[in-house]
Amino acid sequence: MERHQQDLSELTTRLRGNHRRVTGPRQLILNLLRREEHPASAREIHEKLGDLCNLATVYRSLHLLESMRMVKRFDFGDGSARYELLGRDDDGHHHHLICQECRKVVEISDCFPHTLEERIAHRHNFSNVTHQLEFFGICPSCQPA
């Protein structure tokens, strides 16, 4: 996906373009999210960064990056938000299939609810209608033999 192909200089340029400082922790978080295959929680990011960045700074940075539409937040139903890097022109729209046992995440690019969004928006006179949909199941590795 596009988000994994962005280099750190492009991401820091986006920060500067939004009149935000390019701090060490922000660079570390962006660089880590560039390499992640799946959305990561603030705690997972903090654990991977270790003493390089405290947990409160991770949360503040993720909140800022989300407000700038550089990351997207996902809720997998376990009480822990997860974050994924967005590309410059990426709306981040895709879904996930999550194993209820091992928490393995598979990215799903198919999206059928777009036409439903249009009908709902028209029927209720809403604009900018969107959705967030995640699928849950048991992966082959966790299924009983």
Residue positions per predicted region:
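Basic amphipathic alpha-helical segments that dock to polyanions
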Residues: 58-68
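Short capping segments at the starts of secondary-structure elements
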Residues: 22-24, 35-41
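Short, Lys/Arg-enriched N-terminal segment that forms or immediately precedes the first helix
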Residues: 5-19
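Non-DNA-binding regulatory cores of transcription-related proteins
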Residues: 68-145
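Pre-recognition alpha-helix immediately N-terminal to the DNA-recognition helix
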Residues: 27-32
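Short, leucine-enriched amphipathic alpha-helices that occur as contiguous helical runs
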Residues: 8, 25-26
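A short acidic, leucine-rich amphipathic alpha-helix
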Residues: 44-49
